[in-house]
């Protein structure tokens, strides 16, 4: 992509309305623009990150055996009345009437609707287990939306719902999805800690939250110091990870610790995922019954699995930035490489930049080629801000010898590389 053709409205100054780093950087780098309180337009750069995260989440759900569906944003209120949740959500739920005076709502979650889909289409234990997921926009009318997309009113979620014949099988599915979540965050290139948590209004008695460590987190989590080894060794067996102590603040009890208090540390965390074993709460209330192997009608056992995709964008930035801007993990970066031509009027620079751009593109490496008239300092500031993992810098002096500068955005090291060897460093 040529920067001269791209839509990248970067801001030089910090926006006064932004309170946290991720919100500031998302506005400054031209990822989002606010349309109303807690409601944002995703501009091209931000949308690329959102789609990259969405695709990684989707890939891991598919590998776990979940099947993708797409439920509507707008839901009939009678399903929520039937499940007993309609009055509990209060003013956070956006409700309205259509022209026929039917009460509708903008879905804040989907347990009620997926249970309705299940009960009308699956009747026998022979059709179980089933695990259905969708990726859809939601709305909760937060009384005080803040921190940009971290705590917005409109947000993108991945929600999965599993259905099993009994508790034993349901817990087995739950553990498989726990594994899928560990794999998902590894693939995203982020350090997420799974902590034992409350189920809240969803219901149920088994629950884990997944937190990214960040100073701006709203939750305090307590966890075994061994979790820090995941940063350097992400391939630790999931069963070992599950044996390590980690708990949300409301579940942490210093009098009931399985390890010494000296082995535990605490941090602020941003919740980016939450999985629940619900049991039969919704199936009983909504009559979602299955014929078991003895021909007896029994309520189906359910679990729910959420990942905040739009919130993940902000959380990843909070954990991966410095004073110059964002430092994207490679798998979610909007562009893996920023190609910076320092002199677009120098024929050798133009020739070399075109060659590099063509070779990287042929390898399906996403490149943002800065072919603008901007000064060198301005170009460096822009590309540090948007956070491409690599910057390839082409200037007249070194271009004459077919040499470019390669900057690793994360560690800040710049080295001279011969063009013919460049591809090996990027891959």
Swiss-Prot record:
It comes from the Bacteria. PROSITE patterns: AA_TRNA_LIGASE_II. PANTHER family: MITOCHONDRIAL RIBOSOME PROTEIN L39/PROLYL-TRNA LIGASE FAMILY MEMBER, PROLINE--TRNA LIGASE. One of its GO terms (cellular component) is cytosol. This is Proline--tRNA ligase. GO terms for molecular function: ATP binding; proline-tRNA ligase activity. It is found in: Cytoplasm. Homodimer. Disulfide bonds: none annotated. CDD domains: ProRS_anticodon_short, ProRS_core_prok. InterPro entries: aa-tRNA-synt_IIb, aa-tRNA-synth_II, aa-tRNA-synth_II/BPL/LPL, Anticodon-bd, Anticodon-bd_dom_sf, Pro-tRNA-ligase_IIa, Pro-tRNA-synth_IIa_bac-type, Pro-tRNA_synthetase. It comes from Rickettsia felis (strain ATCC VR-1525 / URRWXCal2). The keyword RNA-binding does not apply. It catalyses: tRNA(Pro) + L-proline + ATP = L-prolyl-tRNA(Pro) + AMP + diphosphate. GO terms for biological process: prolyl-tRNA aminoacylation. Catalyzes the attachment of proline to tRNA(Pro) in a two-step reaction: proline is first activated by ATP to form Pro-AMP and then transferred to the acceptor end of tRNA(Pro). Belongs to the class-II aminoacyl-tRNA synthetase family. ProS type 2 subfamily. NCBIfam families: PRK12325.1, proS_fam_II. HAMAP family: Pro_tRNA_synth_type2. Its EC number is 6.1.1.15. Keywords: Aminoacyl-tRNA synthetase, ATP-binding, Cytoplasm, Ligase, Nucleotide-binding, Protein biosynthesis.
């Amino acid at each position: 992509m040529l920067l001269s053709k791209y839509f990248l409205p970067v801001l030089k100054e910090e926006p006064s309305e932004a309170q946290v780093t991720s919100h500031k950087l998302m506005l400054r780098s031209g990822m989002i623009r606010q349309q109303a309180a807690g409601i944002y337009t995703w501009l091209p750069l931000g949308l690329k990150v959102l789609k990259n995260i969405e695709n990684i989440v989707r890939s891991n759900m598919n590998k776990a055996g979940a099947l993708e569906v797409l439920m509507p944003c707008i839901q009939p209120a009678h399903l929520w009345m039937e499940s007993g949740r309609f009055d509990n959500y209060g003013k956070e739920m956006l409700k309205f009437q259509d022209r026929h005076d039917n009460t509708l709502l903008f879905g804040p979650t989907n347990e009620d609707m997926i249970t309705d889909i299940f009960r009308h289409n699956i009747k026998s234990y022979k059709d179980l287990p089933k695990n259905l997921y969708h990726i859809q926009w939601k709305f909760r009318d937060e009384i005080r939306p803040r921190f940009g997309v971290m705590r917005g009113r409109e947000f993108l979620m991945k929600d999965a719902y599993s259905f099993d014949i009994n508790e034993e099988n349901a817990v087995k599915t739950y553990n498989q999805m726990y594994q899928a979540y560990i794999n998902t965050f590894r693939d995203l290139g982020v350090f997420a800690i799974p902590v034992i948590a409350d189920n809240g209004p969803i219901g149920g008695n088994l629950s884990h939250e997944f937190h990214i460590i960040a100073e701006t987190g709203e939750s305090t989590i307590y966890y075994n110091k061994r979790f820090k080894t995941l940063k350097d060794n992400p391939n630790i067996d999931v069963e070992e990870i599950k044996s390590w102590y980690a708990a949300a603040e409301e579940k942490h009890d210093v009098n009931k610790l399985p390890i010494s208090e000296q082995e535990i540390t605490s941090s602020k965390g941003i919740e980016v995922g939450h999985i629940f074993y619900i049991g039969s709460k919704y199936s009983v209330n909504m009559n979602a019954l299955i014929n078991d192997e003895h021909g007896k009608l029994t309520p189906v056992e359910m679990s729910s699995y959420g990942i905040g995709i739009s919130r993940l964008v902000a959380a990843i930035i909070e954990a991966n930035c410095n004073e110059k801007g964002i430092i994207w993990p490679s798998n979610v970066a909007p562009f893996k490489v920023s190609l910076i031509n320092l002199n677009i009027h120098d024929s050798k620079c133009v020739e070399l930049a075109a060659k590099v751009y063509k070779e990287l593109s042929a390898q399906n490496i996403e490149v943002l080629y800065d072919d603008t008239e901007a000064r060198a300092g301005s170009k460096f500031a822009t590309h540090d801000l948007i956070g491409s993992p690599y910057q390839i810098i082409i200037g007249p002096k070194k271009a004459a010898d077919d040499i470019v500068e390669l900057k690793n955005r994360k560690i800040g090291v710049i080295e001279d590389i011969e063009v013919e060897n460049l591809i090996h460093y990027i891959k």
